[in-house]
Amino acid sequence: MSLQRFLFFALVVFCLISCSSAKKAQHSEVSFEDGIPQIKHLVVIYMENHSFDNLYGEFKGANGLDNARKGNFIQVNKEGEPYQYLPEIPRNSSFPTNLPNKLFNIDQYVTSDKATPDVTHRFFHNQLQIDSGKMDKFAAYNDSKGLAMGYYSTKKLPLYPIAKEYTLCDNFFQSGFGGSYFNHVYLISATAAVWPDAPKSMVANLDADGNLIKDGAITPDGYAVNTVISRNKPYPPQSDTSKLLPPQTMPTIGDRMSEKGVSWAWYSEGWDDAVAGRENNFAYNHEPFLYFAQYKEGTEGRKNLKDQNDFIKAAKEGTLPAVCFVKPGGGNDEHPGGSAVYPSEQGAVKLINDVLNGPNGKDALVILTYDEFGGFFDHVVPPKIDRWGPGSRIPAILIGPFAKKGYIDSTPYETVSILSFIEHRWGLEPLAERDKNANPFKNALIFK
């Protein structure tokens, strides 16, 4: 054997050993149960309204657009007939009127530094869009029509380098069907809010087979599933208080943490301005603890509701509580219609860096995820658990020294996996069956 040939084979063997070692390095040296106490701080950054395919469909190695195209998810109208072209996108003349009936790149028409129209993301509509797993009515049951089939260039996203460096979950689902309000409440309580005597005008009407006749915020049996605002202050000026949700009394993860002496806070952009009655970008339906009696004005629990500026200060000073929920405000949260993807993600990157570069970064886990899919297509059929969901697949990124590096985690997770993690880490009782049974990111984390 020539020296050149010998060196070639030696290099191949070295590469194989190195790759094998890298794979082994992805396994914890200690168990999840023994290692999880190493995490002293959890930071959940809760962005808005994008499906996995919409943002990370082009992520190499993930279950994305290549598989979606193989599935040939032709969109059909409400009668089940295929569209010749995607239905015309309203409220924005940048999109052509004859888009082919398939997935398309949004960036070629509206760059990611500009907001697109909002896309329909409601409780009953999400189920109609999924269409019993056919995934073929996202355009039909959508006010923005064909826009539902759009996606962004993944590598151009500000969060892409972070997703590539750490763990990207490509099998993570929003816990509840539909929109932001419902999934925010579910994130902290693993249950649906109740309003048995809601105004009739707010109640949805379904036929005997469960088909939607008239949409509404409240189910016929009294659960609040679409956007409502809390009767607890602050609420928007000139609100009709008869149409504001009465304070809820079921337990939340905040209650569990406070009972156990675990420090925590929910930080919202614009909170201080909203409380003071000043002009603000605070989103009233994105403040889930505000829906509960335990957090109304004058309560002890209210002290845990803070402004995003307080989070930034605490992150830089190293005074973060054990558990932080961080909620960017309108214009900065990626919500279509009011926020653009690119600058919103730039803001999220700054929040992440504030944590990782601060004194608490060495023992922190950051989870960046989205409340829901925003009405955008995703090709993966959600698992069936109960009447509430899960809904569509959404992105989730685990970041920090305990997240596996350069890893795609295809383990089934959902929004309340975050609750499950908190409960496992700090020894808390589950709130409901859903969080009790959810995987607490066991396969995404690594401990030494």
Map each language-model feature to its residues.
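N-terminal pro-sequences and low-complexity stem/linker regions of secreted or lumenal proteins
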Residues: A22-K448
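Sec-dependent N-terminal signal peptides
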Residues: F6-F14
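Positively charged n-region of N-terminal signal peptides that target proteins for export
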Residues: M1-R5
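C-terminal motif of bacterial Sec signal peptides marking the signal peptidase cleavage site
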Residues: I17-S18
